[in-house]
Amino acid sequence: SEKRRTHIIQNMLYMVEISQININKCKKIFGDNVNISKSDFLNETTKWQTEFNISEFNIILGNPPYNINGMKGKGRSDKGATVIWGKFVDYSLDLLKTNGYCLFFTPNSWTELKSPLAKKILTKQIVLIKNFDVVNAYKLFDKKAGSLPLCYYLIKNNKPSKKTLIYDNLFNKLIDFDIN
């Protein structure tokens, strides 16, 4: 119903966006009364937390910028480019309430399990992972993605106690896998 939709948009959704173009798109979709802060998620925390009067979340969804100041990755690294997507994931995990969920779409390099971020993720329940190789990632983003493998993953903010569902591209189905 329209009443329920309005309640969800005005009382349950909070967005932080730095780009005015993207803010305008969100307002076109959700209306002018959407809770959206024109802020830098990482560097203006006090601003958006004050605007929303909230500092913990039940669910966080994101497709953060992967780099700033250019492209960085296998085969290409622009001078001055810095990878930043991991900072968004790391900070979002800190903002989750106990038993809250975090769903992100990022490069899949964390799945090599070598980084501090990967170690932090492994302390949580990884519910689901789906990987996209370079070719499929490129198609998925309508040929606008860089040449890197991507994945989306759902993390529950509690201790790992169950197997993780991993999408098997060969069999086209989710399989249970014990990551820990």
Regions flagged by a language model, labelled:
Residues 1-134, 155-169:
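SAM-dependent methyltransferase catalytic region
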